[in-house]
Amino acid sequence: MTGRIFYWNMTTFNKAGITEVPKSLDDLMAAGKAFQEKLGDDYYPMHLRIRPYDPDGVLPRVQVRQGLADPVTSTLNYTEEEIAEGLAFIKSLVDGHVMMNLKDYYSANSDTATHQSNEWITGKIAGIFEWDSAATKYSSALDDDNKDGFTVGEEIKFGDYNGGFSKVSMGLAITKTCEHVAEAATLIQFLLNEEKGASIMGSECGIPASKAGLGYAQAAGAVKDLVADANAKVMAFTTNKLDPLFENNDLKASGTGIYQEVFDNIDYGDETPEEAVNGLLDGMESVGYTIA
């Protein structure tokens, strides 16, 4: 199982006079102000890759925080005003210099992945909200001046409820049309549950759910400490499983998805959060959500 957690570049945070990882919304807003005042307009405490591509982190936290989302039945139980509040919350992070406006990010990077952007590599973007299995990808991308500052942060509780969620990071299955069922089952057993296979797999696709496989991978030193640390924090915070419709490609597709359209419209100034609500709800209803 995997989920999202915050990663921070404490090298940059220290330059801004901040010595501890953000643990609250107040900490994030204070960091945005400190970065702008002490480091300049082109330094930001964090980036939400989820806004332009797959915003399956902050919005569910807003929903669950209010006790309004039902990830089991894919029913949207919140009002237009409440989802506007969620969109306005994300906009407030841009307005508070916590993260870069998407227009500026696209101008500098086009559709380049965040960990490959110059801003991340050089520490100008000093945080990311990402999958626990991606820890080493973001750590190894930093240049030599910033690499030692990479830190697995804490989940930030934005309200009365834990908004964390998890999903399967990788699953293997045998199809009904498989012509070699026994052989396929043997391969899955080898990769996930047997010593040699589990030692090869390690934590490359996330922390193994198999107790036997995890034990073999740990004994072989194949479980990366950063990934294990991040996963433990995510699982301790998680209260919900990911709604399977939330990652529907019509919603999350890069360049064409509803999520990107909504946040682009807000960040480019074409719509207010209140005006963007109908487009988001219409898009979610079109893929199977029930609007209560």
Residue ranges of model-derived segments:
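Short helices/loops that flank or line small-molecule/ion binding pockets
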Residues: 13, 30-37, 110-128, 261-269
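A structural signal for short loop-to-beta-strand junctions that line the ligand-binding cleft
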Residues: 1-12, 44-45, 155-164, 240-249
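Glycine-centered hinge/linker elements that transmit conformational signals in sensory
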Residues: 31-33, 75-108, 156
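Beta->alpha turn/N-cap motifs
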Residues: 129-138
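Bilobed periplasmic-binding protein-like "clamshell/Venus-flytrap" ligand-binding domains
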Residues: 37-51, 97-100, 194-204, 287-291
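Periplasmic solute-binding protein
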Residues: 1-20, 48-73, 95, 166-174, ...
